[in-house]
């Protein structure tokens, strides 16, 4: 189902439930127009079209491991995932009433190939001495690469509905191709030590380089550290072990990076379009050579407890997370490009703003009954999180999250200072209009051009009984 608003799924969702699949004569039933747009019978649509999708996928994982000296293990791993996809869709000539018909068939052939591999090598060293000192260290590197390419051809007016191949005669509707990829290289190290299973310390650092960022900002560096104290192993706790057999305090700090964006946004990409004089090119996006890693820091403290020899366990975690240099697409005026249609110049991806998250998690697990034939375990989880946009490039900056083209790019969410991330933005509903008198007396939702300042009462282009009534939140001069 690759047809968007004309696909089987969306047509089934929008079809009125009182419309039958067949009429009394056994023909396909269904309205021919809804608010001026064609409405397809989804069952007929599913049977009329041929939409074949085939995938050949090969995956594998290999490793070599060696222990050259006591306590030291060296391991190298390699994994890959290769995929070939073939999609063919054929729409024959058809007639479905007076509005939905076509005397021209159409075929679409789409091929895609993708490859992902990861190669990781690391060494682990562990040593214990005097029965109380436990030391561990790890050093390694990792490389990953993803690449994908594809092509698509659409033709219409084939001489036969039977021979459904793209090399048949017909007229080209469109042809397109794409190729993309990304790569990452990483180095990492970790050291951990504990004394007598009482005091624990861990330190980690990793450096990551991503092809998604410009030459000056490919590398990001991310440290972390953790401390823990197992109080239940202290001698002064011995008298309480019958009731509480585990009591551990934890604290940690860590930084992680985010590179979840499309490739090559630090440079300007080019797109093609057809003209009467041949193929033309236009800049697809505004470049940002200073694009860099988004970084998040988190501080957390926690406690682990077990009672009655593990029958009851309690874990509490409190955390504070702060993200900076967020990877967001800047909002720019339409005359600079960056509007919401697909053929405009995309606004630049930039690093801006800060967000914060704070909260706690509580987990209680009880092992109520443990029997050979019956086990009963209960688990209670309580979580509380509060997030906030602390800063943007200016306090008045707003980034809209728009629904796709089929809904006119309406704004559904917003990112703005002082609000949670991605807060829903829209009208406030106050119920449904019951009659025409209510519509005429209500604040204007659709202005009547012939009677300005009053709602237009119209079933398709205005407001009608049964439509949603929106709350008027405007203040002086229309400002909320």
Positions of predicted regions on the chain:
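Active-/binding-site microenvironments in catalytic and ligand-binding cores
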Residues: 316
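Outer-membrane beta-barrel "beta-signal"
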Residues: 224-228, 361-363
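Surface-exposed loop/interface segments of Gram-negative outer-membrane beta-barrel transport/assembly proteins
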Residues: 1-59, 75-185, 233-298, 313, ...
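Glycine-centered tight-turn and secondary-structure capping sites
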Residues: 300-304
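Structured alpha-helical segments in the cores of large, soluble enzyme domains
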Residues: 185-195
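Transmembrane beta-strand segments that form the barrel wall of outer-membrane beta-barrel proteins
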Residues: 201-210, 368
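Alpha-helical support elements that line or immediately flank enzyme active sites
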Residues: 60-66, 78-82, 305-307
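Solvent-exposed loop/turn segments connecting transmembrane beta-strands
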Residues: 211-216
């Amino acid at each position: 189902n690759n047809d968007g608003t004309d696909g089987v799924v969306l047509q089934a969702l929008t079809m009125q439930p009182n419309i039958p699949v067949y009429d009394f004569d056994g023909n396909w039933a269904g309205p021919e127009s809804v608010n001026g747009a064609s409405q397809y019978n989804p069952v007929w649509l599913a049977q009329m079209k041929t939409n074949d999708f085939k995938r050949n996928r090969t995956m594998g994982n290999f490793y070599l491991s060696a222990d050259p000296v006591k306590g030291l293990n060296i391991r190298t791993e390699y994994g890959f995932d290769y995929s070939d996809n073939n999609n063919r869709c054929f729409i024959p000539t058809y007639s479905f009433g007076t509005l939905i018909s076509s005397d021209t068939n159409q075929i679409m052939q789409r091929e895609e190939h993708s490859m992902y591999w990861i190669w990781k090598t690391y060494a682990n060293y562990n040593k214990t001495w005097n029965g109380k000192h436990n030391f561990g260290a790890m050093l390694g590197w990792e490389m990953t690469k993803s690449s994908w390419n594809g092509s698509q051809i659409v033709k219409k007016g084939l001489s036969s509905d039977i021979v459904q191949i793209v090399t048949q005669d017909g007229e080209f509707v469109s042809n397109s191709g794409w190729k993309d990829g990304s790569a990452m290289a990483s180095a990492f190290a970790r050291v951990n030590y504990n004394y007598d299973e009482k005091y624990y310390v861990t330190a980690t650092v990793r450096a990551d380089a991503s092809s998604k960022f410009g030459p000056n900002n490919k590398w990001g560096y991310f440290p972390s550290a953790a401390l823990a104290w197992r109080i239940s192993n202290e001698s002064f706790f011995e008298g309480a072990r019958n009731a509480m057999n585990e009591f551990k305090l934890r604290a940690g700090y860590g930084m992680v990076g985010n590179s979840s964006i499309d490739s090559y946004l630090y440079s300007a990409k080019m797109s093609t379009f057809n003209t009467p004089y041949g193929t033309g090119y236009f800049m697809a996006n505004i470049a940002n050579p200073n694009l860099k890693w988004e970084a998040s820091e988190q501080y957390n403290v926690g406690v682990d407890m077990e009672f009655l020899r593990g029958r009851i366990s309690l874990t509490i975690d409190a955390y504070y997370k702060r993200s900076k240099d967020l990877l967001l697409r800047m909002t720019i005026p339409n005359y600079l490009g960056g509007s919401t249609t697909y053929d405009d110049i995309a606004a630049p991806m930039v690093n801006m703003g800060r967000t914060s998250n704070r909260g706690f998690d509580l987990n209680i697990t009880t092992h109520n009954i443990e029997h050979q034939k019956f086990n009963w375990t209960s688990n209670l989880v309580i979580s509380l999180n509060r997030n906030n946009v602390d800063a943007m490039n200016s306090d008045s900056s707003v980034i809209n999250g728009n629904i796709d083209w089929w809904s006119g790019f309406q704004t559904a969410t917003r990112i703005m200072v002082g609000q949670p991330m991605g807060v829903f933005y829209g009208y406030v509903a106050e119920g449904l209009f019951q009659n025409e008198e209510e519509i005429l007396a209500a604040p204007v939702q659709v202005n009547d051009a012939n009677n300005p300042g009053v709602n237009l009462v119209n079933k398709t282009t205005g407001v009608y009984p049964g439509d949603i009534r929106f709350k008027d939140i405007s203040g002086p001069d229309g400002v909320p």
